[in-house]
Each structure stands twice: as structure tokens, then as C-alpha cells.
């Protein structure tokens, strides 16, 4: 997936799901299922409930996302 095709949005982690999946509430109120990007997995970035994150979505399926950044 090319960078130009992605939609980046801010959100908050609502709950942790199995297999490193998370339920994220976006700023616009929508709730999506998100997984951690490979670089965050490789560097052992921990994500907890309530964390502010940046997610990347494809325009083809707006119910799934990839977490690409965790705000401090």
C-alpha cells in the first residue's frame, strides 16, 4: 500500500483485543479495529488503554486500521 493512498487520523485506544489488535475510537467518533505496524512491533512499543495514537487507514475498508505512532 502506497503512502499516498492512506488516510491518517488521530484516535484513543478503547480496549485491547487478542493477537495485538486494539479497538480505537477516532476523533470523529467512529470505532475501528487496529493492529500495530511492523516497526512498532519490532521495537517493542507498548500500547495501553487510553493512549493517544495515530492510525493509518485505507480508503477501501474504513473499519480496519494500522497503528503507526503512539503519542507520549
UniProtKB/Swiss-Prot annotation:
PROSITE patterns: S1_IF1_TYPE. SUPFAM superfamilies: Nucleic acid-binding proteins. Residues 1-72 form the S1-like domain. CDD domains: S1_IF1. It is found in: Cytoplasm. One of its GO terms (molecular function) is ribosome binding. One of its GO terms (cellular component) is cytosol. Disulfide bonds: none annotated. It holds the Pfam family eIF-1a. Keywords: Cytoplasm, Initiation factor, Protein biosynthesis, RNA-binding, rRNA-binding. SMART domains: S1. It comes from the Bacteria. Belongs to the IF-1 family. NCBIfam families: infA. Component of the 30S ribosomal translation pre-initiation complex which assembles on the 30S ribosome in the order IF-2 and IF-3, IF-1 and N-formylmethionyl-tRNA(fMet); mRNA recruitment can occur at any time during PIC assembly. One of the essential components for the initiation of protein synthesis. Stabilizes the binding of IF-2 and IF-3 on the 30S subunit to which N-formylmethionyl-tRNA(fMet) subsequently binds. Helps modulate mRNA selection, yielding the 30S pre-initiation complex (PIC). Upon addition of the 50S ribosomal subunit IF-1, IF-2 and IF-3 are released leaving the mature 70S translation initiation complex. This is Translation initiation factor IF-1. It comes from Haemophilus ducreyi (strain 35000HP / ATCC 700724).
Amino acid at each position: 500500500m502506497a503512502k499516498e493512498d492512506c488516510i491518517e487520523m488521530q484516535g484513543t485506544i478503547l480496549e485491547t483485543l487478542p493477537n495485538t489488535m486494539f479497538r480505537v475510537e477516532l476523533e470523529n467518533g467512529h470505532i475501528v479495529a487496529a493492529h500495530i505496524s511492523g516497526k512498532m512491533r519490532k521495537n517493542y512499543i507498548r500500547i495501553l488503554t487510553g493512549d493517544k495514537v495515530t492510525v493509518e487507514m485505507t480508503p477501501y475498508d474504513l473499519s480496519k486500521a494500522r497503528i503507526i505512532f503512539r503519542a507520549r
